[in-house]
Amino acid sequence: LTIEPDQTKARLLALQIMIDKDSMEQVARLCREGLLYEPSEVMFYYYEGMAYFMLQRNADAIRVLQKGAERIAETTDKELASDLLATLGDVLYDTKLSEEAFLAYDRALEYNANNVVCLNNYAYYLSVLGKKLDKAEEMSKKTVDIKGDDPIYLDTYAWILFLQGQFEQARIYMNEALRYVEETPENAMFFDHAGDIYFRCGDKAKAMTYWKTALKLYPEKANRQKVQRKIWRKRI
């Protein structure tokens, strides 16, 4: 690249090495330089935007991903286009721009209706806001149909069913999700959700067990306080 910086294949290879090393600053640099020679290469926009998002530089991520979205053409790989727009949606939602995020997700699904990451995130964020739960349930069910051994997708689907008042169905999918997770801090929410679901199913003893597990695992004080209140009050 030092001798021939316009060699896209070599740059993409170097990019993959930096991604594997989780060196996001270098990923952003390689993409930024690559766009000087290939300003229509959507992949560079995608990875640069992703790198900025992982570096918590949301404004830069949005700027780059929006430019990339403008470069999507008929010849652009459909899965790449979908991934770029889905990532834009993730960043917009993280920046508290939910309506703009949902528009980006809708566009992402036009390019790849089976983009499970997009479907899951879109469905979950709708459920968090209590919006369009029927649409959220439909999208989430699709992720479970496509990849039914992923605990994240199973948890999302169980939670949406819970919000819809389908408690017994929610318990079935929550139990399935718990088969794939260990008691680690990053999995605390699974047990928190399980506690709520079991409480609504009338099994308060099991609910308390799951809430106590969540309390033990949650690293964030705010989440621990929320679960502690449920334990003290013995209800949601």
Predicted regions located by residue number:
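Residue-level recognition of tetratricopeptide repeat
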Residues: 16, 50, 90, 124-125, ...
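Canonical tetratricopeptide repeat
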Residues: 13, 47, 87, 121, ...
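TPR alpha-solenoid repeat register
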Residues: 10, 44, 77-78, 84, ...
